[in-house]
């Protein structure tokens, strides 16, 4: 790739950001699309966020992704955000529109696309159990409700956090029944058979962590399991689900799909199908 004075710049800001797979998949797509654009990572400490955003604005960067821990903190630094981003309470994509920096959120759409592509799952009329109540859970819950889910149960160690999500969404999505419960394994084991999909939005599953005692065998054999964790590739949760023959998927599909959505926002063009996923899988040796 030749970088010239006309090359347009995209990027990702986060802390840390060296582990991000986004530069690999975005640059693969940009090259395949024949665009004179480049996508680079920017390591931005939390205390430097305001000055970093001001710098990106001044330098004329065309757009950038936003990852942990900046997805909420960046909102007051932008000129405006979309209704989707406001609903999610977070921004993961920023586009320069004239002199303005506009915040978007593609996490929800990426999640729904991944459910369809990786599990063949459509939320309309379905009952879903979501583990966790953080930012990833908020995106999942909102997108599931928008997709017509009948019931969304939020299980979190702090029930109050789960109840906050219930209160945030129950007046917005009248067709979905929301509820919160403790992330207590015996309680979940007693209820898990009532759901068509289980979604883990927590970091449990990374490293040596696991949901000790969670009995996936109680789920309906036709139910599906989605774990947003993708390192390791097969978490203990997914390993147990697959042993029972249930359809399961990790978060790689969501990572790729939200990136595809972001690139379409920046360029006005859809990336070639599969190019981002293939690049990510090659990097992970999958």
UniProtKB/Swiss-Prot annotation:
Keyword Acetylation: no
Disulfide bonds: none
Molecular-function GO terms, alphabetical: NADP binding; shikimate 3-dehydrogenase (NADP+) activity
Catalytic activity: shikimate + NADP(+) = 3-dehydroshikimate + NADPH + H(+)
GO cellular component: cytosol
UniProt keywords, alphabetically: Amino-acid biosynthesis, Aromatic amino acid biosynthesis, NADP, Oxidoreductase
UniProt keyword NADP present: yes
Residues where NADP(+) binds: 132-136, 228, 251
Biological processes per GO annotation: amino acid biosynthetic process; aromatic amino acid family biosynthetic process; chorismate biosynthetic process; shikimate metabolic process
Active site per database record: 71 (proton acceptor)
Residues that hold shikimate according to the record: 20-22, 67, 92, 107, 230
Pathway listed: Metabolic intermediate biosynthesis; chorismate biosynthesis; chorismate from D-erythrose 4-phosphate and phosphoenolpyruvate: step 4/7
EC number: 1.1.1.25
Top-tier EC class: oxidoreductase
Family (UniProt): Belongs to the shikimate dehydrogenase family.
Function description: Involved in the biosynthesis of the chorismate, which leads to the biosynthesis of aromatic amino acids. Catalyzes the reversible NADPH linked reduction of 3-dehydroshikimate (DHSA) to yield shikimate (SA).
SUBUNIT field: Homodimer.
Protein name: Shikimate dehydrogenase (NADP(+))
Organism: Geobacter metallireducens (strain ATCC 53774 / DSM 7210 / GS-15)
Gene: aroE
